[in-house]
Amino acid sequence: MGFKGYILSIVFNGKDFANKYYLMLKEFLKQHNLRDKIALKVVLANDEPASNLYVSIKSRVAKEIGLNVEVIKFSANSVQSDILEVIDRENKNLSTDGIIVQLPLLKGMDLNSILNSIVYSKDVDGLSFVNLGKMILGDKKGFIPCTALAVLKILRDEGIKTLGKTVVVVGRSPLVGRPISILLSSKPYDATVIACHSKSIYLDVYLRQADIVISAVGKPRLIDKSMLCGKPYVIDIGISEIETDNGKILSGDTDFDNIKECVKFITPVKGGIGPVTVLMLMFNTIKAHLINNRMFDVLNRLEKLLEV
């Protein structure tokens, strides 16, 4: 359960949060006669179990709300030109609204070349240079990376104010950390952002100043309660596997059990930011269809429904 005003939910439930909006999107598509008319293509060029799981979740959600989704899977002996050829085909395919590439890629492939081969109007992950540039300039017709958009959505719906607050973002990747830092320091969020990373020597000093901590470095249990002060809000995006006496378990960047009593709000590793990221991918895909078909009045209604 979220909160309004002073009522806080200590541990965020991303599944319930996202499910509420999935139902809204399903009804939205039905109302506007858009069910089964919007197509998402997912390029999968690795054989990692985690990637296959993530793709299956995205596909299931897309189908449940009424989108068409196709997973284009490449074998381990595929080369970069194979992927570029398929992306070029889907760029030209008028029935394709969104194209995403599930990361990581096969070894030897150039990430930027592949991401930037997706035409920006179908880049619903928002990871191309064009869309990252649009984000920096505040162009609302661009696509914001889904995880960064998920962070904004959580902050807004959970009533976590950013105006004038100190936000420490741990992580500087162009996929997650950097977009979050740029967005939160911009209007209308107007936060004072301290951008750190895994090699920041005085990380604990910066963290103690934070009203809000957002971490996305993939270093398990990097942040513990000794590094926090004043019960901040914590959004933990990192995910890693660690060995324990009972086998491998998932861990975030924070030592969850260690800090959960020392914060106002925290996202867990399982059922935290992940479902909301998938939600924002659905939002971006529907948005792409509406922009490409110049359905701007319907787009306005969509943006009011999923306001960030």
Swiss-Prot record:
EC id: 1.5.1.5, 3.5.4.9
Key word Ribonucleoprotein present: no
Gene Ontology cellular component terms for the protein in this record: cytosol
InterPro entries the record matches: Aminoacid_DH-like_N_sf, NAD(P)-bd_dom_sf, THF_DH/CycHdrlase, THF_DH/CycHdrlase_cat_dom, THF_DH/CycHdrlase_NAD-bd_dom
Record GO terms (molecular function): methenyltetrahydrofolate cyclohydrolase activity; methylenetetrahydrofolate dehydrogenase (NADP+) activity
Residues at which NADP(+) binds: G171, R172, S173, S198, I239
Pfam families: THF_DHG_CYH, THF_DHG_CYH_C
Keywords: Amino-acid biosynthesis, Histidine biosynthesis, Hydrolase, Methionine biosynthesis, Multifunctional enzyme, NADP, One-carbon metabolism, Oxidoreductase, Purine biosynthesis
CDD domains listed in its UniProt record: NAD_bind_m-THF_DH_Cyclohyd (cd01080)
Gene Ontology biological process terms from the UniProt entry: L-histidine biosynthetic process; methionine biosynthetic process; purine nucleotide biosynthetic process; tetrahydrofolate interconversion
Pathway in which this enzyme or protein is active: One-carbon metabolism; tetrahydrofolate interconversion
Catalytic activity: (6R)-5,10-methylene-5,6,7,8-tetrahydrofolate + NADP(+) = (6R)-5,10-methenyltetrahydrofolate + NADPH; (6R)-5,10-methenyltetrahydrofolate + H2O = (6R)-10-formyltetrahydrofolate + H(+)
Chain's role: Catalyzes the oxidation of 5,10-methylenetetrahydrofolate to 5,10-methenyltetrahydrofolate and then the hydrolysis of 5,10-methenyltetrahydrofolate to 10-formyltetrahydrofolate.
Subunit structure: Homodimer.
UniProt xrefs under PANTHER family: C-1-TETRAHYDROFOLATE SYNTHASE, CYTOPLASMIC, C-1-TETRAHYDROFOLATE SYNTHASE, CYTOPLASMIC-RELATED
Family: Belongs to the tetrahydrofolate dehydrogenase/cyclohydrolase family.
Name of protein: Bifunctional protein FolD
Organism, scientific name: Borreliella burgdorferi (strain ZS7)
